């Protein structure tokens, strides 16, 4: 069936978040005098990302709020750094610490180099939208900052407001409804194999897994999921760059 709409994941697909995260955390730890609390910058980043994954998963399961997971991530990270009283840090203090980190991270945030050219190519031919495991105000602000918000139909569909997170079928179907296009006529593009590609395919959309590592990319651009030696499931198309979407 012909495609009439395209939905996108944000982080790791359009927004190169890993590089901004690493630079922002390093700068923040220097400013806070915490760099010596870890064996190396790489170890600090490893701890930060491990805690982020755990606390963000709690948010996605509905066990914490979007703000709450940031506060708890901050407490646990500072506790890992040996900061006295970190575990009992008040919400406003934890939120202020995280806000300072985010401000530093945001100075280096950018879209992937292939994002704008791909969206320019698609915008005149398809309805474009966003389905993201995040909060709407957060993702709208981010997309505006990296110059991509204007490409997408409103509402942006995000898990906090929708009430369920990818890979639940309902959030993909809500994205299709926002476009006004039937699921079978919508492609979903994301960098996480299980959450994005398998979830979209199982919801009845045309699934496209962005695996930047397939094109030789590493680090900030690597896709997440199946692994280099694993063949994708039936019904999942693999691309190494968003520029390949021109052949939809």
Regions found by a protein language model. Name each.
Residues 1-50:
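Active-site neighborhood of HAD-like aspartate-dependent phosphohydrolases
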Residues 1-4, 19, 116, 120, ...:
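Asp-based, Mg2+/Mn2+-dependent phosphohydrolase catalytic module
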Residues 22-26, 30, 45, 67-75, ...:
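An amphipathic alpha-helix signature
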Residues 31-37, 80-88, 147-151, 180-181:
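Short helix-capping segments at alpha-helix termini
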Residues 63, 68, 91-92, 99-130:
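Short, acidic loop-to-helix structural element flanking the phosphoryl-transfer center
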Residues 46, 50-100:
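A metal-dependent, Asp-based hydrolase signature
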Residues 15-16, 106, 110, 184:
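Residues in soluble alpha-helical coiled-coils and helical-bundle/repeat scaffolds
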Residues 23-27, 47, 73-76, 100, ...:
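Alpha-helical elements of Rossmann-like donor-binding domains used by nucleotide-donor carbohydrate transfer enzymes
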């Amino acid at each position: 069936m012909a495609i009439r709409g395209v939905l996108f994941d944000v982080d790791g697909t359009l927004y190169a978040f890993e590089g901004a995260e690493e630079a922002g955390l390093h700068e923040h730890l220097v400013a806070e005098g915490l760099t010596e609390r870890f064996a190396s910058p790489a170890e600090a980043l490893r701890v930060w990302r491990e805690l982020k994954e755990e606390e963000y998963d709690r948010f996605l399961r509905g066990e914490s709020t979007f703000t709450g997971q940031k506060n708890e991530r901050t407490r646990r990270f500072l506790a890992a750094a040996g900061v006295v009283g970190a575990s009992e840090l008040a919400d406003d203090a934890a939120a202020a610490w995280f806000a300072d980190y985010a401000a530093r991270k945001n100075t280096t945030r950018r879209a992937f180099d292939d994002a704008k050219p791909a969206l320019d190519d698609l915008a005149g031919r398809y309805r474009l939208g966003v389905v993201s495991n995040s909060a709407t105000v957060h993702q709208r602000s981010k997309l505006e900052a990296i110059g991509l918000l204007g490409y997408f139909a409103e509402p942006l569909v995000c898990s906090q407001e929708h009430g369920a997170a990818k890979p639940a079928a309902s959030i993909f179907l809500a994205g299709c409804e926002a476009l006004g296009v039937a699921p079978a006529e919508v492609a979903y593009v994301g960098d996480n194999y299980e959450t994005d590609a398998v979830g979209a395919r199982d919801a009845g959309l045309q699934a496209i897994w962005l695996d930047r590592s397939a094109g030789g990319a590493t680090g900030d651009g690597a896709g997440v999921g199946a692994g280099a030696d694993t063949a994708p499931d039936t019904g999942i198309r693999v691309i190494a760059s968003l520029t390949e979407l021109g052949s939809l």
